[in-house]
Design a protein with these regions (language model features):
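Sec-dependent signal peptide recognition
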Residues: 1-7
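Hydrophobic h-region of N-terminal signal peptides that target proteins for export
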Residues: 7-17
Length: 209
């Protein structure tokens, strides 16, 4: 029985809080389709990100330091927290200053970088991945296989291989595209605990608001 419990626990993703900053294996760049997040979460919160004046599509959820199994979080760091100006300057790609702050606190502290350098690296990673333009052309909600979203990203980014990208779903909606990158932001294969491809054949994909 004890061996069974050990096996089950060892198979679960590992969250290592309070790890030393800068000690990790690679990054996960997480891109969220804003209209779908608004439909499942943001509207209920009254999030400003979901107002039509913003025209958000694929936004940066975060750049996450990752182990080959598990991930660090809320690390000890000698660097100061970001200023309000720094987090506001990330709104154009992250949707809100609040998200930028949370991402620094949970993930940025584990990068070993200052807040300014972490945000700069996050922006660089976001900019180097081409977000497929086809999704911005939708004029109505559609249902599609999650594999179609993955194929669109692979076509738009020839340097990516299928094992370097995963598409996630939540509550029947396409949720995120997650790309695995080295510390130098070169595409790398994802760990087994990151590859969780959505298998839905009819995932909802909402248009830009």
């Amino acid at each position: 029985m004890r061996w069974l419990v050990f096996w089950v626990l060892s198979a679960l993703p590992v969250l290592a809080e309070g790890e030393k900053a800068g000690e990790f294996d690679y990054y996960v760049l997480s891109l969220s389709w804003s209209p779908n997040w608004c439909a499942t979460t943001g509207d209920a919160r009254g999030s400003e990100q979901c107002e039509t004046r913003h025209d958000y599509g694929w936004i940066l959820h975060g750049l996450w330091p990752q182990f080959h199994q598990g991930w660090p979080a809320y690390c000890r760091t000698p660097h100061s927290a970001p200023s309000r100006r720094m987090t506001r300057e990330m709104e154009d790609i992250q949707g809100s200053a609040g998200l930028a702050w949370h991402q620094w606190k949970k993930h940025g502290t584990c990068s070993g970088l200052s807040a300014a350098d972490y945000f700069a690296l996050s922006r660089k990673a976001y900019d180097q991945i081409t977000r497929p333009a086809v999704f911005r052309k939708l004029d109505r909600s559609v249902k599609l296989p999650a594999s179609v979203v993955e194929e669109a990203f692979l076509k738009a980014n020839p340097d990516l291989e299928p094992d370097m990208l995963t598409i996630t779903c939540r509550d029947g909606y396409i949720e995120e595209a997650r790309v695995c990158l080295s510390k130098d932001l070169n595409p790398v294969p994802c760990g087994r605990d990151v590859i969780r491809d959505c298998r839905l054949e009819g995932a909802v994909f909402d248009p830009i608001r």
